[in-house]
Design a protein with these regions (language model features):
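Short, polar/proline-rich extracytoplasmic segments that appear immediately after membrane translocation
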Residues: 12-55, 62, 67, 79-87, ...
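Short acidic/proline- and small/hydrophobic-mixed sequence motifs that coincide with surface turns
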Residues: 71-76
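Bacterial N-terminal signal peptides
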Residues: 4-14
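A short linear-motif detector with a strong N-terminal bias
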Residues: 26, 54-57, 107-112, 128-130
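Extracellular adhesion/glycan-binding regions together with long Ser/Thr-
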Residues: 101-125
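Short, hydrophobic beta-strand segments
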Residues: 130-137
Length: 154
C-alpha cells in the first residue's frame, strides 16, 4: 500500500506539534576556547642584493611584516645560522635586526639561539622587524645564503 506524500507531511507535522507541545527543560551549554598562538609573515625571502666586502646594507628594503592571526598577542623572537657558499662562510652575527629602520651599526646582532626582540604583535595587528647585513672585509665572492627564523611566543 502506498502512502501519499500529503499523508507523510501531515504525520510529520503532527509529530512536531506533539513534541513542541511537550514539557521543556533548559540545557546549559559551555565551551572552552583554547589559546591559539599563530602568525604569518609578509615575506619569506630577504634579498640583500650584491654587496662589496666590508660594506653593509640599509634596513628599509629588508623588512619582514608579522601579522598575528591567533587569539593571543605574539612576542617575536629571532635566530639564524651562519652565511654559507660552497666551503666559504661568515658569521650569523653579521646579520642584524631592529624594530625600526636604523643604520646597520644600531641593530642587534642575530645569534644562533632564539633572542627576544621585544617586538610585540597584538591580536589581529601587524608589526615589523628590519634586517641588515654587514659583509666582512676580504670575504670570498659568491652567492651566500642564511636561514633566519621568526618565532612567535605567546
Amino acid at each position: 500500500m502506498a502512502i501519499s506524500s500529503a499523508i507523510i507531511g501531515w504525520m510529520i507535522g503532527s509529530m512536531m506539534l506533539v513534541m513542541a507541545g511537550g514539557n521543556t527543560s533548559p540545557v546549559t551549554a559551555s565551551v572552552t576556547i583554547n589559546n591559539y598562538c599563530a602568525f604569518t609573515v609578509s615575506n619569506t625571502a630577504i634579498n640583500f642584493g650584491a654587496l662589496n666586502p666590508g660594506s653593509n646594507t640599509i634596513y628599509s628594503s629588508n623588512v619582514i611584516t608579522v601579522t598575528d592571526s591567533g587569539n593571543l598577542g605574539s612576542n617575536i623572537l629571532t635566530s639564524g645560522n651562519s652565511w654559507t657558499f660552497a666551503s666559504n662562510t661568515f658569521g650569523v652575527t653579521n646579520t642584524v635586526w631592529s624594530s625600526a629602520n636604523v643604520l646597520y651599526g644600531s641593530g642587534t646582532a642575530l645569534t644562533g639561539t632564539s633572542a627576544d626582540t621585544a617586538i610585540v604583535v597584538t591580536t589581529s595587528a601587524t608589526n615589523s622587524i628590519y634586517f641588515g647585513l654587514g659583509v666582512p672585509a676580504g670575504q670570498a665572492p659568491g652567492t651566500y645564503s642564511q636561514t633566519i627564523e621568526i618565532i612567535s611566543s605567546c
